[in-house]
Amino acid sequence: SRRQRQMCIRDRYNPDIMDAAKVNVLPKVEEPSVSKKEVEYATFTTPATSIPAGTIGAYTGKEIQPGFIPGYVRLGYGNYGNLDVLANYLFRLSDRDKLNVRFQMDGMDGKLTMPETDTKWNAYYYRTRANIDYIHQFNKVDFNIAANFGLSNFNLSPVQPGKQKFTSGDFHLGVKSTDENYPIQFEAETNLMMYNRQNNNTFFFNDKVGETQVHTKGLISGAISDEQSINIGLDMRNLIYNKDLKLADDLQVYENRTALALNPHYKLSSDSWNLRAGANVDISFGSGKSFRVSPDVIAQYIFSDSYVLYAQATGGKLVNDFRRLETICPYALPAGPILDTYEQLNAAIGFKASPYPGLWINLYGGYQDLKDDFFEVQEEMDYNNNPSLPDGDGQGENTPSPVTAHQYLNLEFSNTNNFYAGMKISYEYKDLIALSAAGTYRNWDAKEKYSLYMKPACEINFSADFRPITGLNINLGYDYIGRTKVEGIKAAAVSDLHAGASYNVFKGVSVYARINNILNKKYQYYLGYPTEGLNFLGGLSFSF
């Protein structure tokens, strides 16, 4: 991952655009941390060339350090109509009250070359996000209230005609205990979340559908010694849809349901050991398997201050609500009932070491088992034989001319598993240089082999950050994702060589620029959807 330094916007949303391959259910290994380091937020931007990205989480207030600069504005533009707008301001109303306001818009509008046919597509994709967050610090409890709004506007490919709009909004209330002297600690939150999809699968139905979700989370911890605690976590989602949308075979696409997750676990934190031993107990009402259990075990052994042996066995349910469907593949349409994905097991072992100051080496390997894992598939539909479409009677009469068959990108499900192994090396020298290289290999298997077509088989990442003089930051990076071969066919690998720089021209004023896909490679993050060729973005940022 790129190491980008340092902006004082204190929220938990990374302004970088996430690669599409990073937002699904690929294995997550709990990499141990020997010493805590304060999070640094980026002034350097990654342009919206791999949109869409993960949805924004609510801002959560953090302790503000002396000399903190509360305001930040960033404006950038590039070829392919790449747009980058970000504004954030943190109002310090008092020593106990803070209000954060944020607005972000990114996107693109340009001609892309379709794979296989080489035809031009006038593509556009714009995302707008607005957030407001307030936190009050009582003597022993923090109170948090927040509201978030999101809007995504984009069009579908020429072989899948149409456009789409996602509108989301949510309201958040939360409390968290802060007095560490108390033997009982707690945190709780509830979220009222709305989401609307304007258009759906035009071959089966074309109607707006709304999702209302009440998401409640809680954690209570009881200390049994200075190093040990017993904890119980709860996560409950109630999902309600405003319409009964059914496919041609009378299958319900979105089902009202309740997903309840309980997470009892024991924790030990000492100079040499970090242990977490528990279970994920998942209960479902209204859809899917009603009862599942998976482990929640993490063990880390630290020796010689900078050497760590670690192992994990984790799992749990991934609720496929509208927000997650957008991050997985916004272009895909439901071809059957939407099921929730379950990670039955993610087991890994690893070794992390720092044999030299600033140098870290991390080796790991493991196995992951997924139930009802998503995959994308293209289906060709004959426009003339669907009476539900406008101007069609199902007999080939009164149909648009010329006669066409559209390829719809659909979401389907399959049980998958993979063995994986990887290594990461990083090196930092003072505040002048930061280097990192990582590689991961995965061996996938599934009953439906074609479901693995877009799965990553090999990932390689390299990043180099330099600060040769005060105020100048230079970054060079490379991202590679090799796809899984299915029946002798393999999708083109993602190969993105990118570079960028930012320079502090005046106090509080910086100029930045970035170039992506320098090699001008053709690849896809989503099946059948091209990405931009060589592209650049530049602009100004202001802190005040």
Stretches with model-predicted labels:
Residues 5-9:
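Short, small-residue-biased leader/transition segments that mark boundaries at the very start
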Residues 52-57, 64-73, 77-117, 122-130, ...:
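Outer-membrane beta-barrel translocator/receptor signature
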Residues 67, 77-81, 120-126, 163-167, ...:
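Short sequence motifs at beta-strands and strand-loop junctions characteristic
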Residues 68, 73, 274-276, 282-286, ...:
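Exposed, low-structure sequence patches enriched in small/polar residues
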Residues 93, 132, 136-140, 173-181, ...:
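Outer-membrane beta-barrel proteins
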Residues 93-113, 231-240, 244, 253-284, ...:
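Surface-exposed extracellular loop regions of Gram-negative outer-membrane beta-barrel proteins
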Residues 108-115, 119-129, 143-185, 189-213:
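Flexible loop and strand-edge segments within Gram-negative outer membrane beta-barrel domains
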Residues 169-174, 189-271, 451:
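Outer-membrane beta-barrel transmembrane domain signature of Gram-negative proteins
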